[in-house]
């Protein structure tokens, strides 16, 4: 993984930049932007958003992200017990939108609005052709752009792993966080009758506001409840978006015999509550990972973003208008801390004052 200095010299970070340090705390520091490479433009970030899943696994004194504890062998594509792949300080982020402030030697117009998946940093460099390809339409908000960069594609990719089996039928999404809420909307736009399950009433209220039927995971048997309503064969596909292995087990229980479960969440540590000798074994349930690092065979990054933009512009999917609590980039520590209160805060955004 690149060091902070390598990121700076490559033009990926500059100016006010958010870091997670060795104690697990968050700070905002500043770096002198590197000179622009030939053919690149400089973008000033207007807004970025913190991932309440992946980024939070690097945060805090008990950070659990596997890259902090094992080494990723790219050739073999497996983790090994060796010096970890990532070390603090970590400069992360992958949901951002901004404006071109220096076109360099290119023909890209100054002031062009751009979306992307760069880090929480004030300035970033981008090849001109990519900036033009990722221009943010004027009818979309900055927060829409932030979510077109990566959040929307995450969810479009996840729904693609349903392989169309959800169309015209009943599907379930576990987790009413940002990923779950957008996945549910994409699945509905793709023809599914979607039900959303979560343990937090405040998040289910957001799902209901988007028009979804919901079920509170209150410790009762949610799978049995829905199967009694829908029938044993009523639910073909479930998406697990919470990152809880207990929820993954319930997703396996809730689908029909030989049904499909798409695991979208980032599961940490050992899989507590996941009993593979139960319904997974006896019902022949198919379990597939729908994580964005592994694109569905029908998709490319370009098609994922194009579909996200289409859904956002025709208002089939609410992106930027989903609730988010905004902090100045200087108070990034407060933005991370707020995500430890999931009943009150769905997601947080950083404002760069541009």
Task: Please state what every model-predicted region is.
Residues 1-13, 252, 302-354:
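C-terminal hydrophobic helical "lid"/dimerization subdomain
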Residues 117-130:
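A structural motif shared across PLP-dependent enzymes of the aminotransferase-like
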Residues 163-167, 205, 213-288:
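Glycine-rich cofactor phosphate-binding loops and adjacent beta1-alpha1 units
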Residues 142-220:
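Mid-domain Rossmann-like dinucleotide-binding core that forms the NAD(H)/NADP(H) cofactor-binding site
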Residues 47, 112-114, 123, 170, ...:
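Residue-level marker of beta-strand positions
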Residues 224-228, 232, 273-323, 334:
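C-terminal substrate-binding/catalytic core of Rossmann-like NAD(P)-dependent dehydrogenases/reductases
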Residues 34-49, 61-118:
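Glycine-rich beta-strand-centered segment in the early N-terminal region that forms part
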């Amino acid at each position: 993984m690149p060091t902070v200095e390598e990121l700076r010299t490559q033009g990926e970070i500059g100016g006010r930049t958010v870091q997670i340090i060795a104690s697990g705390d968050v700070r905002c520091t500043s770096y002198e932007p590197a000179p622009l490479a030939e053919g690149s433009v400089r973008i000033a970030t207007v807004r970025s958003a913190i991932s309440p899943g992946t980024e939070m696994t690097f945060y805090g004194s008990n950070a659990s992200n596997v890259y902090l504890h094992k080494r990723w062998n790219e050739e073999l594509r497996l983790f090994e017990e060796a010096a970890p792949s990532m070390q603090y300080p970590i400069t992360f982020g992958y949901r951002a939108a901004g404006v071109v402030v220096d076109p360099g030697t290119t023909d890209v117009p100054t002031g062009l609005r751009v979306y992307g998946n760069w880090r929480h940093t004030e300035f970033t460099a981008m090849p001109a052709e990519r900036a033009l390809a990722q221009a943010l339409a004027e009818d979309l908000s900055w927060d829409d752009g932030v979510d077109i960069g990566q959040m929307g594609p995450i969810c479009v990719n996840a729904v693609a792993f349903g392989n169309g089996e959800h169309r015209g039928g009943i599907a379930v999404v576990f987790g009413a966080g940002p990923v779950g809420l957008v996945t549910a909307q994409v699945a509905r736009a793709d023809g599914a009758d979607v039900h959303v399950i979560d343990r937090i009433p405040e998040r289910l209220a957001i799902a209901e506001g988007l028009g979804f039927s919901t079920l509170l995971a209150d410790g009762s048997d949610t799978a049995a409840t829905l199967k009694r309503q829908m029938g044993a064969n009523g639910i073909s596909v479930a998406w697990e978006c919470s990152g809880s292995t207990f929820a993954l087990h319930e997703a396996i229980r809730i689908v029909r015999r030989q049904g499909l479960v798409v695991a979208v969440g980032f599961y940490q540590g050992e899989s507590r509550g996941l009993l593979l000798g139960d319904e997974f074994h006896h019902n022949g349930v198919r379990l597939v990972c729908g994580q964005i690092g592994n694109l569905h065979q029908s998709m490319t990054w370009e098609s994922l973003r194009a579909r996200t933009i289409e859904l956002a512009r025709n208002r089939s999917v609410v992106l930027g208008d989903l609730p988010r609590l905004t902090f100045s980039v200087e108070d990034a520590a407060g933005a991370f801390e707020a995500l430890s209160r999931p009943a009150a805060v769905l997601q947080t955004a950083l404002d760069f004052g541009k």
